[in-house]
């Protein structure tokens, strides 16, 4: 059986007042062509179908048309909700849809939703696990200690019947410890959403969503498909793709990726004004940084004639750097040791603030040092 794995469509997303929907629709057409050329049997969509829990009608129509075309091609489709989606809205008509071979995760009811497919190698079980928080799982297992995201997922899997003699695929939208993130993903405080990859050892392939960079985690068959396109300038160096997974007999799983070609790339442009103006005209989404010491007042307008889809514009020179240094120094002088420590901790820990325990240790050390000085 061959299936395609994609995730994090974020249909309807906007950035700096630019709508991505037209690009997203064209990329979904590319996915259809890849499915056709690869002769895929199914498509797995691992969450964050929409950018918002209440998506705009145009985004919903785009997804409806995409799913309809996949079904016209004879593919089975599996969809779960992500942290950006409303599990209730995603699962509308799920009972009716499954009769057509479209399997949509329902709002979590304490059980792992499973679908059994059949091919020449026997049964293949696809399990659907929508994005979960500990509080959602705790109510179904009141006798268990469920504090972290890992506790929650482990509890669900422990109470589910996963027959390891069969081929098992899990579609999941969570954060795996060690995965490389970008600015466009939501983060929790202190890394509480981390889940160890070993939790999924019973599954032959784990189709992950949530992280926007395509990547494998500990093994080739535990993989983030990545987002449909670049959604922040922290992703400019990423190559977006679709994962194509072919499962033979138990233990025989092959994975390769097929690149996606966005109608407009997202990239950084930097240089002196005359250098930037000498660049070829481009409708890519760009962040332009000028290095001129005295750029003309209308530099932004001038640059937009070469880059009409310029999303951000900035000037970095000796003056702006000096201004930044002065402001930073003044800000530091007006901050308490606790605030300075918090800033440093955030810098070292992906913008996560220090917890109460860290602050208590800091205060204890301060008292100890102040006592020695006296």
Feature locations, PLM:
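Conserved beta-sheet core of the metallophosphoesterase superfamily
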Residues: 99, 182-253
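Active-site neighborhood of divalent metal-dependent phosphoester/pyrophosphate hydrolases
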Residues: 40-58, 75-88, 168, 174-191
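N-terminal active-site segment of His-dependent metallophosphoesterases
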Residues: 1-68, 356-368, 372-373
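Metal-dependent catalytic neighborhoods of phosphoester/phosphodiester hydrolases
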Residues: 14-16, 49-67, 81-101, 106, ...
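Binuclear metal-dependent phosphoesterase catalytic core
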Residues: 112-124, 129, 222-285
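Accessory, non-catalytic peripheral segments of nucleic-acid enzymes
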Residues: 37, 42, 246-374
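Active-site neighborhood of phospho(di)ester-bond hydrolases with catalytic His/Asp-centered motifs
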Residues: 6-7, 43-48, 76-83, 103-108, ...
């Amino acid at each position: 059986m061959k299936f395609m794995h994609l995730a994090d469509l974020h249909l309807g997303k906007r950035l700096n007042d630019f709508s991505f929907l037209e690009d997203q629709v064209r990329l979904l057409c590319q996915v259809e062509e890849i499915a056709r050329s690869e002769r895929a049997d199914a498509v797995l969509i691992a969450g964050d179908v929409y950018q918002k829990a209440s998506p705009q009608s145009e985004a919903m129509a785009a997804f409806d048309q995409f799913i309809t075309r996949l079904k016209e091609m004879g593919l089975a489709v599996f969809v779960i909700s992500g942290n950006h989606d409303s599990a209730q809205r995603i699962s509308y008509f799920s009972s009716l849809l499954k009769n057509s071979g479209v399997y949509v995760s329902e709002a979590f009811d304490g059980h792992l939703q499973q679908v059994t497919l059949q091919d020449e190698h026997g049964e293949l079980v696809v399990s659907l696990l929508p994005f979960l928080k500990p509080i959602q799982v705790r109510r179904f297992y009141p006798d268990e200690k469920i504090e972290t995201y890992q506790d929650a997922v482990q509890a669900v899997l422990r109470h589910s019947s996963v027959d390891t003699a069969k081929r098992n695929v899990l579609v999941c939208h969570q954060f795996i410890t060690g995965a490389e993130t970008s600015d466009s993903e939501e983060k929790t405080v202190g890394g509480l959403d981390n889940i160890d990859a070993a939790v999924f050892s019973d599954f032959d392939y784990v189709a992950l969503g949530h992280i926007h960079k395509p990547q494998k985690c500990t093994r080739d068959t535990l993989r983030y498909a990545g987002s449909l396109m670049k959604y922040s300038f922290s992703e400019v160096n990423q190559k977006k793709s679709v994962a194509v997974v072919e499962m033979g007999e138990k233990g025989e799983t092959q994975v390769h990726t097929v690149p996606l070609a966005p109608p407009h790339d997202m990239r950084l442009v930097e240089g002196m004004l005359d250098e930037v103006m000498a660049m070829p005209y481009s409708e890519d989404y760009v962040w332009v940084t000028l290095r001129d010491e005295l750029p003309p007042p209308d530099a932004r307008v001038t640059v937009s004639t070469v880059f009409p889809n310029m999303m951000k514009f900035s000037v970095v020179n000796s003056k702006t750097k000096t201004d930044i240094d002065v402001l930073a120094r003044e800000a530091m002088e007006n901050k308490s040791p606790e605030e300075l420590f918090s800033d440093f901790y955030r810098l070292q820990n992906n913008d996560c603030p220090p917890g109460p325990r860290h602050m208590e240790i800091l205060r204890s050390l301060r008292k100890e040092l102040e006592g020695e000085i006296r």
